[in-house]
Amino acid sequence: GQGAMVASGASLIENKESGIIKNNNSIGMYILGDSESLAINRGIIANEGFHGMWISKGTGENYGTIRNQSEYGVSLLYNASFENYGLIENNGAYGIWAYEGSTAVNQAGGIVRNAGNNGMNVITEGAVLTTAINNGLIENTGEYGMSSTGVNGSVVNNGTIKNLSKYGMAAVEGSSAVNTGIIENVGSHGMSASTGASAINEGTIKNIGSRGMNAENGGTIENKENGIIANTSNHGMHAIGIGSLAINRGIIQNTGTYSMWIGANAVGKNYGILQNKGSYGVVVADKGRMENYGIIENTGDNGI
């Protein structure tokens, strides 16, 4: 059938604390296009089918555990909403997937562990804002901790993202990513923006991986006045490609290689403070351009 538990017509479906749903076929818990229906999981959903929980226009809540080995741990369509207070483990495609006007929130105390493709993902193709918000913890050993695609797509981190792999937060195709919390990057990119998207840091990025913030293919990255990038590895901020822009208004603390690296026709602007105790405060290469309106404190090898 369509699902183990299905709700429509202002109904409630609830998987209790002792309940276990093993979904090997289609859908574990399903709201069938009804904005007044509610699905609550307090037990365990083990998804090896298509959707662990599928919410179309309704509301979903997780206080238990959702384990996704297949396509979608939780999928939201058409102005649906979902809040996670429990644990979502994703070894498949999407831990939480939000589409066209939907909102997904990982609340304080909630955990999303992503060893697959996307911990929390937003896709929008229309004019309606679609958002994923993390107030809890995201642990990423897969591709993306949080990612967004499309002009009205947005991912926001107010909690903690621990990125051990490729991307802590990524925005593409005109979407946006905002960090007001903490991103610990041991992998490739703490935050990344490309193809007309933007990534904004108002919190703290601790980079001991490759790049704290990265812009490419016309993306924009900005470290705001209250933002801190602590770089002990390769790049605090990195921008390449025509139309790419890196702006620092806050503080970049560099004890690694580069505070800012600007290349391949990209533009960098510093209005804040670059504290360089490492190799380079700023490096500009391959027709890049750098403008300094702020302060570069160099006690390392090279200021610019």
Feature-to-residue mapping (PLM):
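Glycine-rich beta-solenoid repeat tracts in large extracellular/virion proteins
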Residues: Q2-S8, I27-D34, F50-K57, Y72-Y78, ...
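Beta-strand-rich solenoid/repeat architectures in extracellular/passenger domains
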Residues: G1, L12-N25, R42-G49, Y63-S70, ...
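Short aromatic-enriched loop/helix-cap "lid" or pocket-rim segments at secondary-structure transitions
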Residues: M290
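Short beta-strand/loop motifs in extracellular/secreted proteins, especially
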Residues: S11, S37
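Beta-strand repeat architectures
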Residues: S18-G19, G33, G218-G219
